[in-house]
Amino acid sequence: MKKNIFITSLLILLLLLSSCTGDTCIDPDDFGFITFNVSSRYNPGEITSRHEGDQVTPWRDSAYKVNGYPLTIMVRPWNYILGDKNTSGQLSAWCPWYGQKNNTTTLAPFCVKLQPCTFWDNARFDMCTPNPENRNDAMISNPPCIMTDGVGLYFLIAAKNTDPNISPDSQRRPQGITKHLGELTSSVGYEFYSISSTGQFLKAGGINYQYNGEDKSKYAQSPLYFKIIDKFYDDNSGQYRLVIKSGVSDTRPDPLQFLTDLIKKVLFGKDGMIKKTYQQIIDTPGYKISVSAILTLYIMFTVLSFLIGNINLTHVELIIRIFKISIISILLSTDKAWTFFHDYLFVFFIDGVQQILQIINEAAATGPGSQSLLGLLISTQTLSKLFSLLFVDWLGFIYIILYLIALYFIFFLIFKATIIYLTALITIGMIIIMGPIFICFMLFNITRSLFENWLRQLISYALQPIILFAGIAFISMIIRTEIYSTLGFGVCKHDFPNLGPINEIFGSFLEDIDPSLGNSIFYWWFPVPMKGGINNFHKAKILVPNDHIVVDASCKNDHDKCKHCAAYECIDERYIELPFLDLVKDSTRINNFINGKFVQLDGILLIFVSIYLLSKFNDTAVSTAQFIAGTSGNLTDIQKVNQQSYESLSQQINRPLNYVAQAVSAPVTSRISAGTEQASMFFAEKFENMMMERLEKQALSSSANKAVQNEVKRKYGIDSKDVKMNAIKDYEDGISGLLKNLPKRNELKVKELSQMKFIQLRDKISANKYDVQDYAALSKEQKTELDKLLKDANLRALASEANFTKDYQEAYKQAHQEMSGRGIGLFGKNIGVLRSWQEMEHRVNVKRKLKEEKRIGIGEKIYAGYTGIKRAALTKILGKDLRDAYEGNLTSAEWHDFEYNDPRLRTYSEKLKDDEKAREYEELRMHINKETIAVQADILSPEYLVKLEKAGRQSDVEYYQGLAQKQLIHDVHSRLFEEGEPVMMGDRFMREKATDSQMRDMIDNAHKKYAELIDVDRYTRRQEYYDIIHEKAKENLEQTYKELKDHFKSDNISIEEMPSLIAQKVKDTNTGSEIDKKITEEINNFNTDVKNYEYSTAVLNKIEDRKQAIMNEVNAQIDKINKYRASAKMEQYVKPILNEGRKLRTLEDHLKNMT
C-alpha cells in the first residue's frame, strides 16, 4: 500500500510540474528558456519629454547579466488570423495607436484585427534608434498597423558601473551596446522559428548578437535591458514576449544550490560563524601572550644561532625568516588578522573553489536549459516533452518509467555529491578556525610538519569538490546531449479528452485562471508534428542550439583545427522540428522521427551507462583529491560521512522502486552492458593514446626507464647508446633547409615529409622541383643535380638516423607494454629483484595456461579425428551430395562445416589444427625469450648473429638461425592470414568453394602483403642504416687505396700491407714533431673503416637472407593456391615474387676488383 502511495505521489508531482508552464506550445529547443515580457506602455510618472512628440522612457531591467557567449533573443510570433488570442499569455505585438491605460499587456480592441506593419524597401533598420539626432519616423507603408517580430524593440548591454536610467539623457543615449531586435534575420543567413499557440511553425523575429574582439571580456557580467522605443507612448498598447535562448547567466534557483548557498552564508558570510570564531580565538588574551612568547623565542633562537655560527643566514634565508615573523605578527593585530588571512589565503579555498565550480558548470552546459543537470531533467518543458510520448508510441510508457528511474538515481548521485561538497565546505571552515594555532607552527622545524599537514588538509578538502564536480560535468555533458537528441522536438497542449460543448462552458473561466489552459481543464501534451511523414518536416538554415564541432574540408584530416561552436553561435541546415540533430551524423534518429518513432531507447541506455560511470567516479573523487594533496592516509573518510547522511533515506525510497527497476530492467540489461563496454573502450582508447605519447617522449629523454631500455636492447637489438636523441628534429631541420631552395615550397609540409622514407622524399622533391611524377622520370642531368642537392643537405643519413630513432621509440613502447602485460608494474620496472620475481611468476602462469589448452586440444583433436572417419565413411556410402544433405543428423557436422564468424571460413577441425600451431609458437616464443634473457641480447637479430660468426661460434649461429626461421614463418603466416583480406582461406573452402577470381585476388594480395612484411619487419628496416655505414666505409677505403696505389705506383696492394704503407706515406709526405700522432690517427681511421665495412657487409647479407626467406615463404603460399587452382582445372595464374637482392663482396675481393 505504501509503495503504491509513493509511486502515485511521485507521478502526480511530476505531472503537476509538467503543467506549470504557461505556454500552449513548447519549441523543440526549449528546455527551460528564460522568458521576459516588454510592454509598450509606461506609467505617466516614468515618461519625460522635452517637447510634444519627443517622449523618453526608462529601460526595463531584465535582472539578468550577459556572460560573453552569443546573445540569442527571439520574439514570439503572433497572428490573430491564425488563431492567436489577445491575452497576456499569448500576445506578442504592439500598436502605436488607440491604446488606453488598461492595454499594458493587450492590444486596443481597434488594433486587434489590423495587419502587421510593412515598411518602404523593408527599411526596418531606420527606426527610432536610441540616438537623439535621429528624429525620423519609421517608414511605415500601411498605417495604422501593428508591430510584430521585434520591430521597435531594442536591447541594451549596459557598460559596467553605469545606470542607463539615471537621467533622461542617459535613457536617450545609454553607454553600452544597443541593437534592434526587429531586423530581417534572412539577411544574415538564418531564420528564427517558433510554434504558435495553434501548433504551427512560424517565422519569428529576434537577434543573435556575437561580440567583437575585446567586447566579450569588456561586457561580461554586464546587465541586460530592453525597451520599445517610440516618440509618443501615451496611445501605445500591447507587449512583446521574449525568449532569451543563450548569452545570459542563469540566476534561477537550482534545487540543491539554495542549500549550499544557505550553508555558505551561515559559515562564511559577513557575520558568519567562521569569522566570529576566528576573531574570538585571536581576541583571547592567553592566545596573544602565547603568540608573543613564541615569536620572541623564535627571534632569540635565530639571533643566537647566527652569533654562534650554527646557521648561515643567506639573503634568501633572511627574507624567509622575516616573512615568517611578519605573518605571525599579523596574528597579534585583531583588526587586520581576519582581513589579511581571508583576502590573501582563505579566499582561494572558499571563493576560488566556487569560481572554478561555476566555470566547470558553465562549460558543461552545452545547450539550452538550466546549467544544472538536475534542473534540466525536471524542468517543466522537459517533463512535458517526456509525457507527450505516452500516447504516440507503445514504447512511450517504458521510456517514461526508465527516465524516472534514471532521474531517481541521478538525484541521489548529485545529492551524494552535494553532501560531499557541503561536508568539505564545513571541514574547510573548521580547518580555517584552527588556522591561528597551526600558522604559528611554521616557525620551528619540530612543529613545521603540523603546519604542513594543516595546509595539506586545507588543499585536499578544497580539491575534493573540484574533482568531483569536474567528473559530474563531464558525465552531464553526455546526458545533456542524449536529452537534447531524444526529446528535442516541439509539443503542444490538446484537449484530452475533448468534452465538446462542455469545454465551451468552462472556456472563459479557465482562460482567466491560466491563458494556456484553452477550453478544457483536461488536456495532454502531444508532439509537433504528431504524426510522421517527410511532408511534416521542413529544412531551413537555423542557429544550431547546442555546442558542436564543425568538421569541414579544411580540417577533415586534422580535427584539432576544426572550429568549436557554442550553442547558437553557428548556422547549419537542419530540420526546424529537430534542431539538435545533424542531417548526416544523426540520420538514423531523424529517420525514426520521420517514420513516427518518437521513442529512442538507445538514448536512455546511454543515460544509464553515464549514471553508472558517475556512480563510480563519485566513489573515487575523494580518494583522488587526497592522493594529489598527499593526505590519502587521513583517518577521516569524507565518503563515510556522506554515506551515513543519506543511507537511511535511500533505503526507504528504494523499497518501492526496487520492484519497478527489476521489472523493466531485464530486457535492457545486455544493452546497458554493451553501452558500458563501449563507453569504457572510449576512455581506455583516449588514455592509451595519452600514455603512448608520454612513452614516446620518455624514450628520448634522460628519464627513460633503464629496465625498459635493457628490454629493448635484449628483445629488439637496439642499444639506446646508438640512438641519436635529436635525430628526428635534425631531419626536420634538414628538410626545412632544403625546402628553401624549391620553387613550390609552400605546397610541401615539413611534418608530412619527415614521416616518409628517403626514396619517397626524393620522389616528392623531384615532383615539386621538376614537375615530374617521380625520381625515375628525371633526366640524367636533373638526377645529378638533385643528388648533389640531397647529398649537400645530408638528407639520406639524417633520414636513416631519424627512422632508427623512431624504431627505437616504437620498440620502447612495445617493451613497456610487454613488461606491463607480464605483470611488471611501476615498482617492478625500477627494482630488479621484484622484476625477476614477476617475470618468473608470469612464465609459470603462461606454462600452466599452455598445458591446460594443450590438454583440451588433445581431446578435441581425438574427437575431431573420430568424426572425420565417420564423415569419410558416410561419403563413401552415400556420396558427397547425399552426405551434405543428411550430414547434420548422421554425423557431427559442426566439426566440418564452415565457421562463418571466422574471416578465413575454416571448419572447426581446421581451426583446431591452427590453434595447435599457435600453442607451438607460444612455446617457441617462450624458449626464444629464455635464450634472450640468458645472453642479454636479441639472439635473432642480424647484428648478434654476425658477432657470433666473428667469434667462431658457428654451431650457435646455426641454432639461432633455426629459431629465427621458425619465428619468421609464424610472423609471415600471421600477416598473410590476418583478418580483412587473408591470403589463404580454410582448406575445405579452397577445395570446394573458392572461385577463380577469389584465388587471383589472394595471389595479388600476397604480393601486397610481401611488400608490407618487408616494410614493417624490424630487422629488414635497418637495411638503410647499414647501407649508409657501408657506403661511407667503402668510399673512405677506396680513397685510401687509390692514394696508396698512386703514391707507391703499385697495383697489387693487400689489406694486410695497407697499415704499414699508410704509415710510410705519412712519413714521406709530412714533416715535423706531430708526424707520429698523424700516423696513429690515419691508421685508426683506416681500421675503423675496415671494421665498419666488414661488419655492415655481414649484417646486410644477413638482412638479405631474411628477405629471401620471407619471399620463399610467401611464394610457398602462392604455390599452394596454384595447386588448388590446378585441382579445380583452372587456368594457371603463376605469379611468383622475385627478389632483386644482392650479395656484398668481402673487402679483399672488392679491392681486387678495383685493380
Curated annotation (Swiss-Prot):
Q: How does it sit in the membrane?
A: Multi-pass membrane protein; Lipid-anchor
Q: Does the keyword NADP apply?
A: no
Q: Which GO terms describe its cellular component?
A: plasma membrane
InterPro entries referenced in this protein's UniProt entry, alphabetically? Conjugal_tfr_TrbL/VirB6
Q: Does the keyword Cell membrane apply?
A: yes
Pfam families assigned? TrbL
Highest taxon in the source lineage: Bacteria
Quote the residue positions with lipidation, kind S-diacylglycerol cysteine.
20
- Show which residues constitute the signal peptide: 1-19
Keywords from the named record: Cell membrane, Lipoprotein, Membrane, Palmitate, Signal, Transmembrane, Transmembrane helix
Q: Lipid moiety-binding region for N-palmitoyl cysteine? A: 20
| UniProt protein name | Uncharacterized lipoprotein RP108
- What is the organism field in this record? Rickettsia prowazekii (strain Madrid E)
Taxon lineage: Bacteria, Pseudomonadati, Pseudomonadota, Alphaproteobacteria, Rickettsiales
